[in-house]
Amino acid sequence: MEDVLTLITMIVLLLLAFHGFGKCSSDLYSRSDFPEGFVFGAGISAYQWEGAVDEDGRKPSVWDTFLHCRKMDNGDIACDGYHKYKEDVQLMAETGLHTFRFSISWSRLISNGRGSINPKGLQFYKNFIQELVKHGIEPHVTLHHYDFPQYLEDDYGGWTNRKIIKDFTAYADVCFREFGNHVKFWTTINEANIFTIGGYNDGNSPPGRCSFPGRNCTLGNSSTETYIVGHNLLLAHASVSRLYKQKYKDIQGGSVGFSLFAMNFTPSTNSKDDEIATKRANDFYLGWMLEPLIYGDYPDVMKRTIGSRLPVFSKEESEQVKGSSDFIGVIHYLTALVTNIDINPSLSGIPDFNSDMGESINILSMRVRISRLPNSDEKCLIFFITLSILEYIKQSYGNPPVYILENGKTMNQDLELQQKDTPRIEYLDAYIGAVLKAVRNGSDTRGYFVWSFMDLYELLNGYKSSFGLYSVNFSDPHRKRSPKLSAHWYSGFLKGKPTFLGSQGITQLHSNFSSSR
């Protein structure tokens, strides 16, 4: 009951904040309502989809080591996309995808992260990209989706060491040279803020570094490494962006972006303290890396709070980082109520990212349907949360080009129930409708990618839940793919049908889906 009341509070607060935007839209819309050039796609990542972790010269990434050491579910086989990519591209074409987002496994392309290219890894990605292009699907490639080579972590501490900037730039150079004639959209780092917090502050994701006691880590320093790694990610991105502009852009005509995990923050009360805390949360989560990319330096509140533990950009570095991202990739699933806390001790007893931020964050997931909340209220919640985050980026950061690179709804992994995944359709309908509203309100949002095209190995969550438009039978050695109702809905939308919901629309959709199987 408390969760429901909290959600209702969130809806009321958002309605008050966005009364100027009008009602929660339930109007029909279609693909043609979006601007020409706006792209729709779906995505996967290498470790979550490929499998074949020890085939054809691939060597371990930090994910392989992290999961096997902890005896957790892993992506050793995952969807077996390495062997089934042609079948998957055919499904993408049948669905009507305009573009497809995927990542390259650094340790498959360059086994040790630097040095010689793995020829079989190179050929796989060439084949995959050519297959996409042959079917009229534009590749959108991420260079780093959490899974950097374990060799570099063992050799010099991975992202804690500036040496990785040179190695990452050399890896990107290979990708641009070998694939750039067919790839026009590159994202350097996926979810840079969450990769850093999870891997170096909390220690709950690879490489699993953090401060002890209080957390289960044997190495790391949450007080400093979180910010050092974030700094190195920004410098590596700037280095890669500079390389592309100097060596490839005139020939290939592509663009290079950077992606961040975005959360919609709302004050838990109308008190001044909570309003200030909400601004601080935005500065720590988004501004931490977005302000350097747009303005060339960290937010003032971070510099004041963190002090000497926050690395400093030299004048040259600031100039290189500023303006280095042609677009911002937004990963968006969550919203949160923020309460100010004057003293927020860390688990280890030393300052870390969470204690530096100085607030209590009650995260409410848009991924999980609260069944006791009326449908109309849930749709309003999704609608205004989406408007809120896109409006915030527009107003705070000069309206940069934005691609929503990940957004979707998880459901429990049940092959029978998942096939008719009506809650996912309702969620996607509300979210895409809100994106359309944001675009009409002036947001320079240029694309939307559903997460995920098919059920995947979900990072840290294994195979318990899934986001896919297509189900994958992970008990079947052949990993059979099957379309869900949401795949049918998304395909219809991409092919120009107006979205249709409500009881009559859902009944019609179920009927069409059943007859097409």
From Swiss-Prot:
Query: Which of this chain's residues carry glycans?
Result: 216, 221, 441, 473, 512
Q: Where is the signal peptide?
A: 1-22
Q: Which reaction does it catalyse?
A: Hydrolysis of terminal, non-reducing beta-D-glucosyl residues with release of beta-D-glucose
Instruction: State the top-level EC class.
Output: hydrolase
Q: Where, by residue number, does a beta-D-glucoside bind?
A: 48, 145, 190-191, 333, 406, 451, 467
* EC number annotated for this UniProt entry: 3.2.1.21
- Pfam families named in the record: Glyco_hydro_1
Q: Which GO terms describe its molecular function?
A: beta-glucosidase activity
Please, one GO biological process term? carbohydrate metabolic process
The active site annotation covers: 191, 406
Against Gene3D superfamilies, the record matches this protein to: Glycosidases
The record's keywords, sorted A to Z, are: Disulfide bond, Glycoprotein, Glycosidase, Hydrolase, Signal
Covalent S-S links between cysteines: 210-217
Family listed: Belongs to the glycosyl hydrolase 1 family.
Protein's name in the database: Beta-glucosidase 1
Q: Which organism is it from?
A: Arabidopsis thaliana
